[in-house]
């Protein structure tokens, strides 16, 4: 059954011809989209010179367009977003309440103040809008400017915000952008693009946006498109397989900016057990880090290291904290977290095995597939910790922080930490092991766009940093004067 159609948005045109079917990631439904092999030659710019119209725009005009776009992205009145939402109910594992909320939070992203903060903090408005002068020690004059590039985005499909951020970053940098829509969020980027065309028809920003779907690995499309004379950068949010797949096309002139899959962790200090009120507050914060978007994100808490100690009192505290976290987790509002629609059956089998092995683990909840907390009764995570999902987390009591740092590596993205004093103690150490973001417990999934991501600054990386040098022979010693007489 064809559940919905994913059009091709081609620089202001909406194309629904030459449709072919594709499978969704969940269920038996299919969707249809134009056969991209018929349109791949039309996706890239004919010439890089065609980007010059973007540089005729003042940043105030860019802000005007984005603000109008944000105002138009009102879920209750925007038919494009409503269509994207209906498709997401078929394509995505998240429940309706969460998917709808992911659309309702879009308008503030495009506000003037927010866009200005992102652009200035992550690139610098002076570099985006003109040539910034510097004088070097040898006397040469440099003028540096951040130019946009021809970018292909392969965004993740875990919520509408990713598609919105992708478009926002591209517009800020004055880039020409092609977006490969994810199969589990197929229409959000299309909906935003169509809304942009409604509020700014024939505008340069609209004419430098392409959104479409093709199956990853389609050689008829990718071998034609993924070339330096078509695109200069690929921003890939995908899973390990898709990121590895993209690397086959990387060559001089074509750069990969990988926002690759990560795991996150939590560290809770002894102060959490000072009194019942503190423990309850810590439990509420930890439950939020676990439960947001049903633990589908890279930033969600999964393994929670607790500096409770492993003696009898320490284990009792860890078990009590586990009970409180479970209670708070199952009480989160539906726009934040619900029992998962498609729990991992293999993980559920592991849970039941742990439940029967109560000398080593205490399992709290999980009988109704609503989520669970597994409290290790030793200082090791469960051996299935990479599988933790669907609101299942593992509390690991430890005696010292050394046990925690040993578990941090290059795959560690976010670490939520309580209390703040412990975070300050660890902030110069954890990055050495691979941690990329340290945040207050409870804010792991409350991510700021105006900040680095995955230990890089992706918006700066999307830019080409161009240097104009001026060397006066009377100031900068010319090489020809170094020749022997």
What are these model-derived regions, one by one?
Residues 115-199:
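Conserved small-residue-rich beta-alpha loop and adjacent elements
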Residues 6-9, 441-446, 454, 483-484:
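Terminal end segments
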Residues 176-180, 235, 257-258, 416:
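Short hydrophobic alpha-helical runs that function as membrane-insertion/retention elements
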Residues 173-178, 204-205, 225-232, 408-413:
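Short, surface-exposed connector motifs at secondary-structure boundaries
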Residues 200-303, 308-310, 451-484:
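Conserved NAD(P)+-binding/catalytic subdomain of aldehyde/semialdehyde dehydrogenases
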Residues 1-143:
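N-terminal Rossmann-like NAD(P)+-binding subdomain of aldehyde/semialdehyde dehydrogenases
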Residues 135-152, 215-225, 374-385:
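Donor nucleotide-activated moiety binding/catalytic core segment of transferases
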């Amino acid at each position: 059954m064809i559940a919905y159609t994913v059009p091709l948005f081609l620089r202001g045109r909406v194309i629904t011809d030459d449709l072919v079917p594709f499978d969704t990631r969940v269920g038996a439904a299919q969707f249809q989209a134009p056969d991209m092999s018929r349109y791949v030659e039309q996706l890239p710019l004919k010439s890089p010179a065609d980007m010059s119209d973007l540089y005729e725009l003042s940043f105030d005009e860019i802000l005007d367009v984005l603000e109008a776009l944000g105002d138009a992205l009102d879920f209750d009145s925007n038919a494009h977003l409503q269509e994207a939402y209906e498709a997401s109910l078929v394509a995505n594992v998240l429940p309706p309440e969460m998917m709808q909320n992911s659309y309702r939070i879009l308008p503030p992203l495009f506000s003037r103040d927010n866009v200005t903060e992102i652009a200035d903090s992550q690139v610098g408005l002076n570099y985006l809008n003109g040539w910034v002068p510097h004088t070097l020690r040898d006397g040469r004059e440099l003028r540096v400017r951040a130019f946009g590039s021809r970018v292909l985005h392969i965004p993740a499909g875990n919520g509408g915000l990713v598609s919105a951020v992708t478009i926002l970053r591209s517009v800020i940098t004055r880039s020409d952008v092609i977006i490969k829509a994810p199969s589990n969020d197929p229409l959000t980027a299309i909906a935003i693009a169509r809304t942009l065309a409604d509020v700014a028809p024939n505008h340069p920003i609209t004419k430098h946006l392409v959104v479409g779907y093709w199956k990853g690995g389609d050689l008829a499309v990718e071998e034609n498109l993924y070339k330096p004379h078509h695109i200069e950068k690929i921003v890939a949010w995908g899973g390990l397989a898709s990121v590895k797949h993209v690397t086959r096309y990387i060559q001089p002139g074509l750069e990969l900016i990988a926002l690759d899959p990560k795991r996150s962790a939590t560290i809770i200090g002894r102060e959490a057990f000072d009194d019942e009120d503190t423990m309850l507050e810590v439990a509420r914060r930890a439950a939020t880090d676990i439960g947001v978007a049903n633990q589908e994100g890279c930033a969600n808490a999964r393994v929670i290291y607790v500096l409770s100690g492993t003696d009898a009192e320490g284990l009792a505290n860890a078990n009590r904290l586990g009970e409180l976290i479970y209670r708070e987790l199952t009480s989160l509002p539906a726009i934040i977290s619900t029992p998962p629609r498609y729990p991992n059956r293999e993980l559920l089998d592991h849970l039941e095995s742990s439940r029967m092995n109560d000398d080593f683990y205490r399992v709290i909840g999980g009988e109704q597939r609503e989520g669970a907390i597994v409290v290790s009764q030793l200082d090791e995570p469960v051996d299935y910790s990479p599988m933790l999902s669907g609101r299942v987390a593992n509390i690991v009591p430890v005696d010292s922080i050394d046990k925690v740092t040993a578990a941090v590596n290059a795959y560690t993205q976010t670490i939520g930490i309580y209390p703040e004093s412990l975070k300050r103690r660890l902030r110069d150490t954890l990055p050495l092991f691979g941690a990329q973001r340290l945040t207050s417990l409870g804010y792991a999934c409350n991510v700021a766009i105006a900040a680095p991501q995955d230990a890089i600054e992706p918006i700066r990386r999307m830019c080409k940093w161009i240097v104009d040098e001026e060397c006066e022979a009377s100031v900068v010693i010319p090489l020809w004067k170094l020749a022997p007489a």
